[in-house]
Amino acid sequence: MVATPVKQKYDIKDISLAPQGRQRIEWAAREMPVLKQIRERFAQEKPFAGIRLVACCHVTTETANLAIALHAGGADSLLIASNPLSTQDDVAACLVADYGIPVYAIKGEDNETYHRHVQIALDHRPNIIIDDGSDVVATLVQERQHQLSDIIGTTEETTTGIVRLRAMFNDGVLTFPAMNVNDADTKHFYDNRYGTGQSTLDGIIRATNILLAGKTIVVAGYGWCGKGVAMRAKGMGADVIVTEISPVPAIEAAMDGFRVMPMAEAAHQGDIFITVTGNKHVIRPEHFAVMKDGAIVCNSGHFDIEIDLKSLKEQAKEVKEVRNFTEQYILPNGKSIIVIGEGRLVNLAAAEGHPSAVMDMSFANQALACEHLVKNKGQLEPGMHSIPVEVDQEIARLKLQAMGIAIDSLTPEQVEYINSWASGT
């Protein structure tokens, strides 16, 4: 089927920002040696020749390096933002001006613009979709079923997006393969834990200039992202409380040395609240009502639904911006609640997102997942697919090599031992 041509070539803030973006993209590339090796191979082999690809991602310097690698591999690609507040406008400008990649992303774009960009992405009639929260895939299956035959597959690297894809599959609407990048060892062990841990606190500090030492920080959720946030907050001198709904991670948090309690109790004690659950309304009106005056709330989960901001706005008698990306909600009782980044991803709304070195592995997974889909076109069943173990291991090997770290290999005796059942006590 012939693709419907996209009428606009791009929708960005200011193309004159390209030189600044180029400089920052090149700086990020210094910390992304694994993706660099993949890009160089793609440039020679052109695995995506003839493939139309849409990426819905945070438009950052790291994402730019992924987009450049896919472009080098021959992809006819288009990039849109996965979050209205996460776009780095100079990066978007550079991709358009220097690489000819159509980008539809403006920092601070409203929801109408965001959804229009999703529709423009689907007008590209993609064969491969790189999604970040599964908004493009969800729109495709709801509104563009006539395009399903174009799809080779999708990749997804967020916990939130994986939950949505599994729900789609259970409802019988996911009719093509989806690569679960999020659960790759070289993604969630590092991106979710070390990336989220560092960048979340970076966002809070940039937005507030607050001292974390001595503060009580409440971390909602103790998955890999929550573990990273709690670990880094503790390391900066905070007293950390963890809230959970699942007994297993709750025990883990307690054994890691954190206080664990329900949000209803933690709400009285916290100075700063960070949600990392991927679920809805983790912080609600009953929690706002008992928080300290000046309590800070923010989110590091994917969507802006973890904090019930609608209810907070309805309660507030006044809302005012007190710093960039930071709003003060003044309640009828005179107390105030501080919200960072409109309840969206604080690390991208108020900072630059994860460090390049950790995104190197995540985006290596994305690039190789796309290649896996193309190489196995028509052979993968609809539904969720894991990153092949050999791909995960190769990414880890390349990263170790780039870090100058050597490890041991099994001796022949050890290989024989682990493959034998005969040796006992």
Curated annotation (Swiss-Prot):
| Reactions that this protein is recorded to catalyse | S-adenosyl-L-homocysteine + H2O = L-homocysteine + adenosine
Q: Which residues are listed for NAD(+) binding in this entry?
A: 158-160, 192, 221-226, 244, 279, 300-302, 347
Nuclease as a keyword of this entry, yes or no, is no
The note on the cofactor says:
Binds 1 NAD(+) per subunit.
The pathway that the record names for this protein is: Amino-acid biosynthesis; L-homocysteine biosynthesis; L-homocysteine from S-adenosyl-L-homocysteine: step 1/1
Protein's GO biological process: L-homocysteine biosynthetic process; one-carbon metabolic process; S-adenosylmethionine cycle
Task: Name what cofactor the protein needs.
Answer: NAD(+)
Which GO cellular component does the record give, naming just one? cytosol
Instruction: Give the main localization category.
Output: cytoplasm
Q: Name one Pfam family in it.
A: AdoHcyase
User: Which InterPro entries does this chain map to?
Assistant: Adenosylhomocyst_ase-like_sf, Adenosylhomocysteinase-like, Ado_hCys_hydrolase_NAD-bd, NAD(P)-bd_dom_sf, S-Ado-L-homoCys_hydrolase_CS
PANTHER family reported for this sequence = ADENOSYLHOMOCYSTEINASE (PTHR23420:SF0)
Q: What does this protein do?
A: May play a key role in the regulation of the intracellular concentration of adenosylhomocysteine.
Give the protein name, as stated in the record.
Answer: Adenosylhomocysteinase
Species this protein is from? Synechocystis sp. (strain ATCC 27184 / PCC 6803 / Kazusa)
